[in-house]
Curated annotation (Swiss-Prot):
Pfam families: AChE_tetra, COesterase. Terminates signal transduction at the neuromuscular junction by rapid hydrolysis of the acetylcholine released into the synaptic cleft. SUPFAM superfamilies: alpha/beta-Hydrolases (SSF53474). Residues 1-19 form the signal peptide. This is Acetylcholinesterase. Disulfide bonds join 94-121, 281-292, 595-713. It is a peripheral membrane protein. Its EC number is 3.1.1.7.
Length: 767
């Protein structure tokens, strides 16, 4: 009888994740023990019907990045603190520029920090239901702000309503922004760049380690973010450093392959030097340069950021993630479209049977071997004709028909067989990849993979690292390839080049939900584009429209700008000021958000990933911006976080129900990978490469659309790259052709020498 009694007692006893998982040393003050120490939160109301949530605010997840730690990746807290730390107030915001364009206007000031700013800002917030007996999903929010601003303390990011409504654990973390988060001297240990992304990654690791302590399931972590936060989510999807830390991802109005979201390593150095000049720290010896910058007050460093970017641009930011060969292994478009060693994958820019984006129509890709990004065992000859495709020859940016990973651009728009292009400095990219650069759509010059800047070839050219291969991977002739050394960040290859880690495979492992709002561009136009303003109808003259195109597509060539004008003009009514305004809305939104995002969706789905897409097209009744701006960038967030559930916010009844429905979609997706369930009405279908279906999210019952901006996005992803490839300066093309041919010959010669040395040591039976 005693064993049965003990068994019943065990079954009925509360578990650590039951309604009594929190300890209470005082009323309404729940306590949780984490891996870094114990914290004491508070119970707070969470909407109508007496709902409550437990909030733990301002939990540190890293050593404060002060003094010599400025510009460095974050350090985890080395030992747990003693005693119980109060987690009942919002943390400091990270240092950032404050928007003063419209003083006193809440529509813009709602995005400014509402807490004191400090470099001691690496804290996170956790909201969870008071007594949920299950292990709910964990939703981890990454805020947007162009990598220049943002804070977890903003009212619009209050996670209590979402946590209570969806019985979820909701987390948000601060990360460093601006130059303090993204100043980049790639390869320098004291300022490698992307430390803001490393902040996010360390917070994500902390969440995974402590999810159970808050009642969450560490195997059901979903990353979600908006704008730069969505781009950050995408970087984690593609980075090998974040693999395994989360299960699902939501990208709201942003993606890592947007033309504003990354720069190259050389451009990162140029911007760092420009900042140094502005604050009195001349660029030279990089260690001394960084020492000078660390000696400046944070506010002075931020003020210097204003001179880094030209003022005549829209949707561009001074300090953003850099392709460092480590966290951001390669440019996002290459990481998405390249295969990076997965056998049988499609080629980097050739998609079997699909339209895709990035200037490829029905390409075959790479057959077997190493797959896309860096060339392979052989490229099937076919009739692909994309901006990077070549008919019967070089099929993609980094591939060759025979050989091993020759670096170059492939061919021109007409499929001519050409040798790879020469080394290009990653100078400021123009909007479509004009000479010396690349953009998110891969126009004219694709960004090169990370390379050690100290490894010259025989002609003095800096060589890229060779791609990964295993010992069983045959080369073009069937010979097994010599094994590569261990791939860590310090292991040289045969030529002394340091090898970047291989990126997380793009697609097939993480379910993705993504989408945009109806008018993505209007919010940015009021910040300096002539003719636009929040207090007028922004009726745009033809002259203002033409000037706005140059600002909306920064650094575009004359021909590219003319193509944009041609495509977005209603030539039956070219001087109509309303149509000119709406066209600029569309140009900025399509170029920066919608088309990159849908290209991301297309590729993720083509690689086997499960994707759901949406268009949010409800204009909030509380929106303070003028009606001509429509449903602007960022104004779905309040519905995702459940702010309409708070009666004091004065939303309509229909908006309360819309918010409940959207929270249910997000919660369902976090739990199961499918937004459907418990909502009623039509089902939200998955996005597929052929159907391209997406859901309209508004106050009406769900409806389904097909091909979100598909036709217009073909202009950005197909036509313009071909146009730029076909019209480069002939004298430059000839010079580049000759130079790169010699580099290519030298590279292949050294590869053959290494292979012959290996084959003498270990004869290859398959030769």
């Amino acid at each position: 009888m005693a064993p049965l009694f003990l068994l019943l007692l065990l079954l009925l006893s509360p578990s650590p994740t039951s309604a009594h998982r929190f300890a209470y040393s005082a009323p309404n003050r729940p306590e949780v023990r984490t891996t870094t120490g114990s914290v004491r939160g508070l119970l707070i109301p969470a909407g109508p019907s007496g709902s409550t949530a437990a909030a733990f605010l301002g939990i540190p997840f890293a050593v404060p990045p002060l003094g010599p730690l400025r510009f460095r990746p974050p350090l985890p807290i080395p030992t747990p603190w003693t005693g119980i730390r109060d987690a009942d107030s919002q943390p400091f915001a990270c240092y950032q520029m404050v928007d003063t364009t419209f003083p006193g206007f809440q529509g813009s000031e709602m995005w400014n920090p509402n807490r004191e700013m400090s470099e001691d800002c690496l804290y996170l917030n956790v909201w969870t239901q008071k007594g949920d007996p299950t292990e709910p999903p964990v939703l981890v929010w990454i805020y947007g702000g162009g990598f220049t601003g943002g804070s977890v303390s903003l009212d619009v990011y209050d996670g209590r309503y979402l946590a209570a409504a969806e019985e979820a654990v909701v987390v948000s973390m601060n990360y460093r922004v601006g130059s303090l988060g993204f100043l980049a001297l790639a390869g320098h240990r004291d300022a490698p760049g992307n430390v803001g992304l490393w902040d996010q990654r360390l917070a994500l690791q902390w969440v995974r380690d402590n999810a159970e302590a808050f009642g969450g399931d560490p195997d059901l972590i979903t990353l979600f973010g908006e704008s730069a936060g969505a781009a950050s989510v995408g970087f984690h999807l593609l980075s090998p450093h974040s693999k395994g830390l989360f299960r699902r991802a939501v990208l709201q109005s942003g993606s890592p392959n947007g033309p504003w979201a990354t720069i190259g390593a050389a451009e990162g150095r140029r911007r760092a030097a420009a900042l140094g000049r502005a604050v009195g720290c001349p660029y030279g010896n990089e260690t001394e340069f960084l020492g000078c910058l660390r000696g400046k007050e944070a506010a002075d460093v931020l003020e210097g950021e204003g001179v880094v970017m030209p003022p005549q641009s829209v949707f561009r930011f001074a300090f953003v993630p850099v392709v460092d060969g480590d966290f951001v292994v390669d440019s996002p478009d290459v990481a998405l479209w390249g295969d990076y060693g997965v056998k049988g994958g499609e080629g980097g820019h050739g998609v079997e049977g699909g339209d895709g984006g990035y200037g490829v129509k029905g390409g075959d890709g790479v057959k077997g071997g190493y797959g896309g990004g860096y060339g392979a065992r052989g490229v099937r000859e076919g009739d692909g004709d994309g901006g990077y495709g070549v008919k019967e020859g070089l099929r993609e940016g980094y591939g060759v028909k025979e050989g091993y990973g020759v670096e170059g651009d492939g061919a021109n728009a007409y499929g001519a067989r050409v040798p790879p292009r020469p080394h290009r400095d990653e100078t400021p990219p123009d909007a479509y990849g004009a000479k010396g650069s690349a953009d998110a759509y891969g126009a004219k010059a694709a960004p090169r993979p990370h390379r050690d800047e100290t490894s010259p070839d025989a002609y003095g050219a800096k060589m890229p690292p060779r791609p990964h291969r295993d010992e069983a991977s045959p080369d073009t002739y069937g010979a097994k390839m010599p094994p590569r050394p261990h791939r860590d960040e310090t292991s040289p290859d045969a030529y002394g080049a340091k090898m970047p880690p291989r990126p997380h495979r793009a697609g097939g492992e993480v379910e993705v939900l993504l989408g945009a709002v109806r008018v993505e561009g209007s919010y940015f136009l009021v910040y300096g584009v002539p003719g636009f303003g929040k207090d007028n109808e922004s009726l745009i003259s033809r002259e203002e429209f033409l000037g706005g195109v140059r600002m909306g597509v920064p650094q575009a060539t004359e021909l590219a700008a003319e193509a944009v004008v041609l495509h977005y003009t209603d030539w039956l009514d070219a001087d109509n000021p309303v149509k000119n305004r709406e066209a600029l809305d569309d140009i900025v939104g399509d170029h920066n958000v919608v088309c990159p995002l849908m290209a991301f969706a297309q590729r993720w789905a083509q690689r086997g990933g499960k994707v759901y897409a949406y268009l949010f097209d409800h204009r909030s009744s509380t929106l303070l911006w003028p009606s001509w701006m429509g449903v602007p960038h960022g104004y779905e967030i309040e519905f995702v976080f459940g702010l309409p559930l708070e009666p004091r916010n004065n939303y309509t009844r229909e908006e309360v129900e819309l918010s409940r429905r959207i929270m249910r979609y997000w919660g369902n997706f976090a739990r199961t990978g499918d937004p459907n369930g418990g909502v009623g009405g039509p089902r939200w279908p998955p996005y597929t490469p052929s159907g391209q279906r997406y859901a309209h999210l508004n106050a009406r019952p769900l409806s389904v659309g097909h091909g979100l901006r598909t036709q217009i996005c073909a202009f950005w992803t197909r036509f313009l790259p071909k146009l730029l490839n076909a019209t480069g300066p002939p004298e430059d093309a000839e010079r580049e052709w000759r130079l790169e041919f010699h580099r290519w010959s030298s590279y292949m010669g050294r590869w053959r020498t290494q292979f012959e040395h290996y084959s003498r040591q270990q004869p290859c039976a398959t030769l």
